[in-house]
Amino acid sequence: ATFKILISPTPVIGPDRPTKKDNHSNKGFFYEGENIRKFISSQPNMYVICGDRHWQYVSKHRKYGIVEFSIGPNSMEHAGGWKQDNVKPEHLYLNVVGGVMTVTIDPKDSPKIIVSHYDVDGNELNKFVATAK
């Protein structure tokens, strides 16, 4: 496959809140997370999609260059858990909102992956596009 996507119930890249200890993006499972990140970084055109975050984001790991997408909640009622102005260096996109996310693979010419975040009304908020290496 040109593109490979790991779908994880929790973040592998993050960032996550400092008090959290239950996923691969923080100190609680650092060893396991580091092994996963090393493997992912050895795979060309591999991305991570995670759930269980109550905000939308796209982040890029500073050491490994891995890009992770967080879908966020389906409703505004469940959006929260992160401050909108708490943008970290690894964030390429951050929005504490509900909505949906789509992933499209365009195989024509130079293959591309297109990941778009939408709000609860279907308005596109962010679009990430990358060409296969």
Give the ranges of each region predicted by the language model.
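Long, structured stretches of catalytic cores involved in phosphate-ester chemistry, encompassing
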Residues: 1-133
